[in-house]
Amino acid sequence: RGSNLTIHPLRNIRD
């Protein structure tokens, strides 16, 4: 998704 504003900075960047 690109919203690394959650607990998963590395995982959110790809999701």
Curated annotation (Swiss-Prot):
Keyword line: Aspartyl protease, Glycoprotein, Hydrolase, Protease, Secreted
GO BP, one annotated term: proteolysis
EC number: 3.4.23.-
Positions in coiled-coil regions: none
Localization: Secreted
GO molecular function list: aspartic-type endopeptidase activity
Protein family (similarity comment): Belongs to the peptidase A1 family.
Identification of the protein by name: Pregnancy-associated glycoprotein 59
Natural source organism: Ovis aries
Taxon lineage: Eukaryota, Metazoa, Chordata, Craniata, Vertebrata
